[in-house]
Amino acid sequence: MTQQGAALQNYNNELVKCIEELCQKREELCRQIQQEEEEKQRLQNEVRQLTEKLARVNENLARKIASRNEFDRTIAETEAAYLKILESSQTLLSVLKREAGNLTKATASEQKSSGGKES
């Protein structure tokens, strides 16, 4: 019976040792879970912050693109109006030169005809 008692005591000791090892492994696993949950929370906060920042950047970008489009439209309209002014100025200059030439010819003709009659 003492042998059986000794064997039972050995089994009991081994069982206790195995249970303690399992408890230690469980505690280590709990620490790892806690660390990973903290890391997960940290990453979720970073993602939330980055998402908010991305939304702000997108809003700013949309406003700036709209402003750039307004600049493009204004520049295009101004350039078109300026080209019309240039064309009108060129036409006006041509008409003015032609009329000035006609007036010069008319004045020269009048001077010739009045100069010839008086002589």
UniProtKB/Swiss-Prot annotation:
Modified residues (N-acetylthreonine): 2
Primary localization: nucleus
Keyword Cell division: yes
Compartments where located: Nucleus; Cytoplasm, Cytoskeleton, Microtubule organizing center, Centrosome; Cytoplasm, Cytoskeleton, Microtubule organizing center, Centrosome, Centriole; Midbody
Chain coiled-coil ranges: 13-70
Molecular functions per Gene Ontology: identical protein binding; microtubule binding
Matching InterPro entries: SSNA1_fam
Keyword entries, A-Z: Acetylation, Cell cycle, Cell division, Cell projection, Cilium, Coiled coil, Cytoplasm, Cytoskeleton, Flagellum, Neurogenesis, Nucleus
Keyword Acetylation in annotation: yes
Superkingdom, taxonomy of origin: Eukaryota
Region (Important for localization to the centrosome): 2-32
GO cellular component term, pick one: nucleus
BP terms from Gene Ontology: axon arborization; axon extension; axonogenesis; cell division; intraciliary transport; microtubule cytoskeleton organization; microtubule nucleation; receptor clustering
Family (UniProt): Belongs to the SSNA1 family.
Role of this protein: Microtubule-binding protein which stabilizes dynamic microtubules by slowing growth and shrinkage at both plus and minus ends and serves as a sensor of microtubule damage, protecting microtubules from the microtubule-severing enzyme SPAST. Induces microtubule branching which is mediated by the formation of long SSNA1 fibrils which guide microtubule protofilaments to split apart from the mother microtubule and form daughter microtubules. Plays a role in axon outgrowth and branching. Required for cell division.
Complex formation: Self-associates to form fibrils. Also forms dimers as well as monomers. Interacts with SPAST.
PANTHER family: MICROTUBULE NUCLEATION FACTOR SSNA1, SJOEGREN SYNDROME NUCLEAR AUTOANTIGEN 1
Protein name per Swiss-Prot or TrEMBL: Microtubule nucleation factor SSNA1
Species this protein is from: Bos taurus (Bovine)
Higher taxonomy: Eukaryota, Metazoa, Chordata, Craniata, Vertebrata
